[in-house]
């Protein structure tokens, strides 16, 4: 009888598939790459914006995580028949709290706050416009914060798809202070 029970236990251990509970453990790290739309989606319009970013996330207790990364945001402001680009290069660091996850540890929802600092360039530093007008906005160092709602969906043990909604507030520049971003990304667990 003991031999029969041992065979059943061994077969259950060998043939039940992978364990899904080994995700978001303390000190696990992942590299994520994101692409976002900034301040709405307006195909064909002159006021569209987008951003690209990369970050390193390190998990802590309870599935929470620290995230440190960099981001490039380009927002076009309409002016007559053309557009004036405003580019922001920022570094950010923040803490994200896990607010929801499923029992199999496939989907995680995070809410977090980040501090940001960087540089803003208006029209790539050119003050004179094509029609002879002069820009009074200047390039500047910027600082501020961001609130983020982030969703991770694991498609494999070391690969997760990301979706996020983010509100950035930055001071120091001459242009808009608030930027709403939404987008997608991919995360690779590296240890």
Q: Where are the regions that the model predicts?
A:
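Cleavable N-terminal export/targeting peptides
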Residues: 1-28, 191
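Short glycine/proline- and aromatic-enriched beta-strand/turn motifs that initiate or cap beta-hairpins
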Residues: 20-75, 187-191
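Residues that define the transmembrane beta-barrel architecture of outer-membrane proteins
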Residues: 27-31, 46-52, 83-91, 107, ...
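Residue-level detection of beta-strand scaffold positions
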Residues: 34-36, 49, 65-67, 74, ...
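Extracellular loop and loop/strand-boundary signature of outer-membrane beta-barrel proteins
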Residues: 40-42, 77-84, 131-137, 169-173
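Gram-negative (and chloroplast) outer-membrane scaffold detector with strong preference
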Residues: 55-130, 159, 188-191
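Predominantly the C-terminal beta-signal and adjacent terminal strand-loop region
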Residues: 73-75, 150-191
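Extended low-complexity acidic/polar segments
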Residues: 124-165, 188
